[in-house]
């Protein structure tokens, strides 16, 4: 057993961030979920012990997340809430104003993590945006600040020009795109890699390698994919609107994949990107 294992159904372990805060290693994301789906999913996740909820201004469901959190009765200090700066709000003042607007929608006094959603390099505003987020952290609106979808170039540019290192870089990461080089860069800068789309949009559910490993442990394909990602040392965000799937996906702390099975899943890497290319994408 390692620090990622424990009793089935227990809360997720936490990972240390570079700013002395901590973050649960596993949480629920709500991208592309309707308000009703979001409220149900967040409520279901909180019920099974999940304490990290990841939303974004661009998802349009921050208010629904806030309602589910309020209805849960769970003390704010026990929760870890992430939201993200929309590309349309980028800029120094834009980032600060957008953070306040997100807090209003969420019904919260602060977020635990505030991320730049996409670098949108063609706009040339991601460095100034991070500067605004530094201010948001300074005034207590965000406990930790970070980036999402940042390549090595954009990450190091932010660090070099603002003299502040993001706490987290949230990136697409699954066995088809294991991001080995970027994970190494993040680690060299003491930035936590947080994976999204860890289940590869279901494309690996019927893969013989994944299924054979799952059968070996008596687990689902999704559980094995999440466990693989966690054992790489990443924090992970998974998405589901189904309460049973949420409970199952969160229940990954009572087993450990052997090195041979980690290697077998790692071997599926072929560079397939299922989400937009950060170098060219200007949406969200």
Swiss-Prot record:
<protein>
    <recommendedName>
        <fullName>Aldo-keto reductase MAV_3816</fullName>
        <ecNumber>1.1.1.-</ecNumber>
    </recommendedName>
</protein>
<dbReference type="InterPro" id="IPR020471">
    <property type="entry name" value="AKR"/>
</dbReference>
<feature type="active site" description="Proton donor">
    <location>
        <position position="59"/>
    </location>
</feature>
<feature type="binding site">
    <location>
        <position position="241"/>
    </location>
    <ligand>
        <name>NADPH</name>
    </ligand>
</feature>
<feature type="binding site">
    <location>
        <position position="199"/>
    </location>
    <ligand>
        <name>NADPH</name>
    </ligand>
</feature>
<dbReference type="GO" id="GO:0004033">
    <property type="term" value="F:aldo-keto reductase (NADPH) activity"/>
</dbReference>
<feature type="binding site">
    <location>
        <position position="240"/>
    </location>
    <ligand>
        <name>NADPH</name>
    </ligand>
</feature>
<dbReference type="InterPro" id="IPR036812">
    <property type="entry name" value="NADP_OxRdtase_dom_sf"/>
</dbReference>
<dbReference type="Pfam" id="PF00248">
    <property type="entry name" value="Aldo_ket_red"/>
</dbReference>
<dbReference type="InterPro" id="IPR018170">
    <property type="entry name" value="Aldo/ket_reductase_CS"/>
</dbReference>
<feature type="binding site">
    <location>
        <position position="248"/>
    </location>
    <ligand>
        <name>NADPH</name>
    </ligand>
</feature>
<dbReference type="InterPro" id="IPR023210">
    <property type="entry name" value="NADP_OxRdtase_dom"/>
</dbReference>
<feature type="binding site">
    <location>
        <position position="275"/>
    </location>
    <ligand>
        <name>NADPH</name>
    </ligand>
</feature>
<feature type="binding site">
    <location>
        <position position="239"/>
    </location>
    <ligand>
        <name>NADPH</name>
    </ligand>
</feature>
<feature type="binding site">
    <location>
        <position position="237"/>
    </location>
    <ligand>
        <name>NADPH</name>
    </ligand>
</feature>
<comment type="similarity">
    <text>Belongs to the aldo/keto reductase family.</text>
</comment>
<keyword id="KW-0521">NADP</keyword>
<keyword id="KW-0560">Oxidoreductase</keyword>
